[in-house]
Amino acid sequence: MNRIAIMVIRTFLGLFFLAAGLSKVGQPMQTLAAVYSYQIVLPDGLASAIAHTLPWVEIILGLALLSGVFMPVTLAATASLLLAFTALTAQAWWRELPIDCGCLDLSGLHPSLAALTTPGGATLRNLFLLGLTALLALIVRSPQRSATGEN
């Protein structure tokens, strides 16, 4: 059961991050505009660095999740990124900023999924993804897996 759960969660998270990164990689100016839309005071150089590196971080995390390599580090990095995303979208939601989160737009799959790009929808989605990441970390580090030598 654990192997199936690990594979399903890893695949879901991996595909999500891979798609998110690929959707941004060729559009640094749109990503930069999204960074600025959160109205967080950042030096221009840092905002630009985020816009140019974030897609690649998401792609690397997606590939690492899909391949299952370096899972403790991969899960820690995934959780850290999701915590940062959650803090950003939550503050935008709290401040009622009328922005698009600048994240993966799934509205092409179904129009109702456009709500996931609002600050509130993105916050809830990020919390769900963070929960999946925590669940995956618990399953991967479970005593049964350690006792059988699986890691």
Show the residue positions of the predicted features.
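Membrane-interfacial helix-loop segments of redox and metal-homeostasis proteins
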Residues: 1-148
